[in-house]
Amino acid sequence: MERRTLLKTLALAFLARQADAAPPANMKGIEELQKNWKTFLPAGANVPSPTEPVKLSKDEWRKKLPAESFHVMREEGTERAGTSPLNSEKRAGIFACAGCGLPVFTSEMKFESGTGWPSFFTTIPGVFETKKDYYLIYPRVEYHCIRCGGHHGHLFDDGPAPTGKRYCNNGVALRFIPKDGKA
């Protein structure tokens, strides 16, 4: 290999590594969005803490949740694509866990993925736990509410910049709380 070619290759490799090491410029915006999520709540709203666990029996969950929400959240089912009214929800506000009311996303975290399910590129910090799901043979990452353990959906690496993440959420696992307080 010629010396000039070797030097060019090394320089390009160094620059590529530096670019990978530096956080994207708009990640600061994500951090601010995550930090300031409470600004999307209606005035005077009380929200549960993720450190207050909700433990109910299967029968208690069955009584508390509508049938489809129970199937998704307690039996790790999936709602039919395109059926959730939350797909078209555009108002400012908070998306909370339908099982326990824990805020999990803001309206600013939502994006149109074209999949038929409400999709988000990031979350309110500390609200979900993840685990591998081998239901469809290949491994996927599913996420559950940290407070009540309810299944919400799956996490994919095909979302928009800067996170590249898509939290594909079942609409029946969420309830929307508009910032203006009007249902």
Regions from the language model: what does each represent?
Residues 1-14:
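N-terminal secretory signal peptides and thylakoid transit peptides that target proteins
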